[in-house]
Amino acid sequence: MIQPESQFFLFGMGDREKYIYKNKSLIRYKDNLCIYSWDGYDEEFIFDEYTVILSKKGEGRVVLCENETGFFVNDQCLSESKINLPTFEGFKYQKQLKILHHEILVNIIDGKPVPNYFVYNKPWYRDGAMMGMVLKITNNLHLIKDWILSLTELYDYNNQMAEPDNLGQLLYLISLVSNKDNPLVEKVINEAKRISIDGKLTGITDGSDHTIYSTQWMIFALKALGIENDYFKIPNKFDDYARMFWMDRQGVERETFFDNKYNWLYPYLWWAVKHFENEPIDESLLQITYPMTWEKQASQAKYENIRQLSNIYADNQFSAPHTWHGAEMFLYLIEMEK
């Protein structure tokens, strides 16, 4: 985890205006305009309450706080809209879940779920689908419903090619807010069959052949839509991405050589495999901090754009918070409670 120049906090969950708090200033994201500055004030961060408190002797205090109604500076509401913020009362990892939920919600911009809104300007179907699983649990699907229903492309083309796992991810997204009668469903299934051999999706995902992973997504999404499947089948071959698909382990052999070494570049991959294997998590990876999630050296991220938040982040090709990482952590911690 790379530390920025100074502690920051992002305000503007869901479809609210985005604001950056850092260096005792509140900056509006869209035009980089400093709205408030509190030089000489002491600051206190309460990450799991989405709150920053500034105080100065003789001047009283200023409270920046975001809740289910809006984002407030004391009694002034800077952005208002309804979102659901569960307290996760009674959960072992209550504070972590609240922070992770925030890191997902804050990366919904203009109704679109993106991995990190500084370095990615459009959604990825995979990250969006994982975010959708979280939003379903927290009753916040209304935040991305319009985006899902507006989709027309079968692939997101974010890696400059048509990646087969996108098809199942798109179908799953549709299942969250619509049903099998959605006009895109038939097109997706026909495309999946077109690129399949013996019921197994073919093609390149993340630069490699991940046939099992892509087919897993398709079967999972059809089940979510209530569509009977007698065509797509899990292939009998090795695919290291298969162990990331914890949503349905059927037909996938557990691997005996799982590398426990943490993936500091793409931690969501490590978390997904941990979830699949039902492995315990080292408590050092669950410390209360902010942000809790990140990605480093991703090929399609525009890291220069995150200088607005941190020069150190930009120089190190680092973005935080990150929604796929956040979703994998959140969903495993939720399952661990069961």
Residues of each region from the PLM?
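Low-complexity, Ser/Thr/Pro/Gly-enriched N-terminal "stalk/linker" regions
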Residues: M1-P123
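Aromatic-rich carbohydrate-recognition surfaces in CAZymes
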Residues: T87, K122-I234
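Intrinsic-disorder/low-complexity, polar/charged segments
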Residues: E103, N107-I108, E163, L225, ...
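Non-catalytic carbohydrate-binding regions of carbohydrate-active enzymes
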Residues: E5-Q7, D15, P235-K338
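Generic low-polarity alpha-helical segments
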Residues: M1-Q3, M13, I27, I53-S55, ...
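Extended, well-ordered alpha-helical scaffold segments
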Residues: K92, Q96-L100, N139-D156, K180-D198, ...
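Polar/charged alpha-helical tracts
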Residues: K18, L54, V62-C65, P183-E186, ...
